[in-house]
């Protein structure tokens, strides 16, 4: 349902809440979702990965393994600086890279059925050797590596996450109390690029991200730069980067 023009689905979800609002699902041929534009931003809980999504992959790969650290940081910043409520997956705050595999504690016929079911599910995936869900080592491989947060890379990730959370608490949370319904607008989309803005009584928040391989020209984003990563952008956004701006006041546009 999201493979075709994923940037359009993401932009709409950020601006309006749901990617599908009654449109026909390409996968099922049935209507999917309901209209969400009447809801305030805090009605939506967003995540870029969770236990179900990661655990159902054959090898339990986290986003950092699939997309790389640079893209993942851009997406993490988008998650934490949008007006929706963010949900972090365990270890995401320090860049945990261990997999989160599908594991169970079943016995007898049920254990056998689950093992065979997982193998059958990925039978058409060439080269995939699915770990046994009931094997103790499958569970052990899925446990967090708490030492990683104390590594130089882990410390940098934690500092990055803390900075984003502080910015959210100081600048974005105060806007949300007066938000009564969806106030988002999709400004621009292109492969790997989106720009969205949200208008509140207290100001206009704008966000643009680029995880493509090329530089993209920015639309007009009003206000002062709240956050830019890896550096400030002037008129364009390079690959694997993000900018968030805030224009204060009810008349901000």
How would you label these PLM feature ranges?
Residues 208-212:
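Asparagine-centered strand-capping/turn motif at beta-strand->loop junctions
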């Amino acid at each position: 349902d999201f493979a075709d023009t994923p940037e359009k689905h993401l932009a709409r979800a950020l601006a309006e809440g749901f990617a599908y609002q009654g449109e026909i699902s390409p996968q099922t041929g049935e209507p999917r979702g309901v209209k969400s534009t009447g809801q305030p931003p805090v009605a939506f809980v967003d995540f870029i990965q969770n236990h179900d999504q990661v655990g159902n992959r054959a090898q339990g790969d986290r986003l950092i393994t699939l997309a790389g650290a640079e893209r993942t940081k851009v997406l993490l910043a988008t998650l934490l600086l949008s007006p929706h409520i963010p949900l972090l997956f365990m270890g995401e705050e320090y860049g945990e890279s261990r997999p989160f595999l599908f594991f169970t504690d079943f016995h007898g016929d049920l254990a056998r059925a689950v093992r065979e079911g997982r193998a059958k599910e990925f039978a058409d995936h060439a080269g995939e050797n699915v770990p046994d869900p009931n094997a103790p080592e499958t569970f052990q491989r899925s446990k967090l590596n708490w030492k990683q947060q104390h590594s130089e890379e882990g410390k940098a990730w934690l500092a990055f996450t803390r900075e984003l959370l502080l910015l959210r608490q100081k600048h974005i949370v105060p806007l949300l109390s007066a938000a009564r319904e969806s106030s988002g607008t999709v400004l621009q989309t292109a492969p790997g690029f989106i720009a969205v803005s949200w208008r509140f009584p207290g100001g206009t928040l704008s966000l643009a991200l680029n995880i493509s391989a090329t530089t993209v020209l920015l639309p007009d984003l009003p206000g002062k730069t709240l956050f830019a990563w890896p550096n400030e952008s002037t008129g364009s956004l390079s690959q694997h980067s993000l900018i968030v701006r805030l224009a204060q006041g009810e008349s901000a546009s």
